[in-house]
């Protein structure tokens, strides 16, 4: 996709480290002191569930400003079936360009590409205030539970969007994120030493 001075295109192997550093900058001290997302991204690329056709970067005036990626996943339906879906993320925009509409542009483009590949639905963890603008709703409205969250407890972070209308009709079940999203924090700490040193801060609003 090319629009004005914005390009969305597949990620190239030779820019993996540059993209990882961008992700690190975007998530640093946001949800926890430091971040894990750049290591998660590094690990997901080698995961069997990784969808290389849906591994995107965004450029503005030739400079990388964002990325998004998808993983194959499934819902374990209560009737015993496994319903193929996709998981999404990490997705990011560089800190200096957040809240300028680039994130929604990247999100909407990549979701449409997932639809073109035949993806029926996308589930992931996110903020409904942002992702709701692109048609995501809380997954509980589809009858989908998040693994490990007891029934009745808050799972408002768990979002879903049908890409094929009616794809989740009549389905109830449980979603577990693909294994690649679960990383060893000690290994993540070692990986982070490959990047420029940054101060980890405990800040209000962090989740961990």
Please report, for each region that a protein language model flagged, where it lies by residue.
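Conserved active-site alpha-helix within GNAT-family acetyltransferase domains
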Residues: 116-119, 126-153
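A conserved beta-turn-beta hairpin within the catalytic core of GNAT-like acetyltransferases
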Residues: 74-88, 98
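A short beta-loop-alpha structural element at the N-terminal edge
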Residues: 7-19
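Active-site rim helix/loop that mediates acceptor-substrate recognition in acyltransferases
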Residues: 20-23, 27-69, 74-75
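Acidic/histidine-enriched, glycine/proline-rich intrinsically disordered or flexible terminal extensions
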Residues: 165-208
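Conserved acetyl-CoA-binding loop-helix of GNAT-fold acetyltransferases
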Residues: 88, 93, 99-112, 123-124
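Internal, conserved structured core segments that host functional sites
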Residues: 54, 58, 89-92, 119, ...
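Conserved glycine-rich acetyl-CoA-binding loop
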Residues: 63, 81, 94-105, 117, ...
């Amino acid at each position: 996709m090319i629009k004005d001075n914005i390009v969305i295109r597949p990620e190239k192997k030779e820019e993996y480290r540059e993209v990882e550093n961008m992700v690190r900058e975007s998530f640093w001290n946001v949800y926890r002191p430091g971040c894990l997302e750049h290591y998660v991204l590094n690990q997901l690329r080698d995961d069997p569930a990784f969808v290389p056709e849906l591994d995107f970067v965004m450029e503005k005036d030739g400079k990388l400003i964002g990325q998004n990626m998808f993983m194959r996943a499934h819902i374990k339906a209560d009737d015993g079936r496994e319903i193929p879906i996709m998981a999404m993320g990490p997705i990011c925009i560089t800190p200096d360009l957040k809240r300028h509409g680039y994130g929604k542009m990247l999100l909407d483009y990549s979701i449409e590409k997932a639809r073109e590949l035949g993806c029926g639905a996308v589930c992931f963890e996110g903020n409904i205030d942002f992702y709701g603008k692109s048609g995501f709703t809380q997954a509980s409205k589809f009858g989908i539970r998040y693994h490990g969250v007891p029934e009745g407890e808050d799972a408002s972070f768990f979002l879903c969007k049908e890409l094929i209308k009616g794809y989740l009709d009549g389905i109830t079940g449980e979603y577990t994120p693909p294994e690649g999203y679960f990383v060893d924090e000690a290994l993540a700490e070692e990986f982070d030493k490959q990047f420029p040193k940054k101060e980890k801060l405990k800040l209000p609003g962090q989740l961990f």
